[in-house]
Amino acid sequence: RRKDGYTDMEEMQKDKVYGRDIFETRNLTFEPSVNLATPPNYRLGPGDEVIIDIWGTNQATIRDNVSPDGSITIPDLGLIYLNGMTIAEANQYLRKELNKIYAGLDNEQNPSSQIKVTLGNSRTIQVNVMGEVFQPGTYALSSFSTVFHALYRAGGVSDIGSLRNIQVVRGGQKIATVDVYDFIMKGKINDDIRLQEGDVIIVPPYEALVSIEGNVKRPMKYEMKNNESVATLLKYAGGFSGDAYTRSLRMIRQNGKEYQIYTIDDIDYSVFQD
């Protein structure tokens, strides 16, 4: 242990920004699993492979890719437009259409044949990752890809990029703001939305970095939001270590060339904002 109380490892850690290395971990790519069932809200688009299985009195398997105009071709029936439909919607629609050539499919009370529509190979989408990432650009991704996977492909968030205000723009409108800390701290993946063709991910610069040192479990730098308090910072840092004096702490705030020093009592931790 060094004279200043830190080990060499702790000294290196306290200069790091918490969460920034999540996209640098080789074994954590956030790549979508090909073995999962198709999400119920997944919408078919050009390039998706549609598999139609029919069994019972009638038996057939039909496979086709959705064309650029959003259709598949079914022998003896012609073009069927599926673009924008979920698998459930496509299943219902195809049941009625295929009943024209396979009798008994659309008899809900006692169908003599059954139909099941599944997704084969999924399409590739183009997504733009812009702003404070190491490798901004346009990426070809699986249509199951999420924001986190796109950020991983772009090399992760840069040294001045925000982990907590990542914006997703679709059709010129901001549709989501992603906070990586919600995933790291709480395991929440609600904000890690599935991407669509033409989506833009924008990583702006961070607004505030706060360094916490001394007897806490994770002495590091943390990106803080405007409404977060000292209590939140302590929570991010894992709380006080066993030998810490917990009744008060000292905060140094830089204002231009001047430094302001505050002593904060424990009763004010939840109201004093960084």
Where are the regions a protein language model picked out?
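Ser/Thr/Pro/Gly-biased, low-complexity, turn-/loop-rich segments
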Residues: 1-274
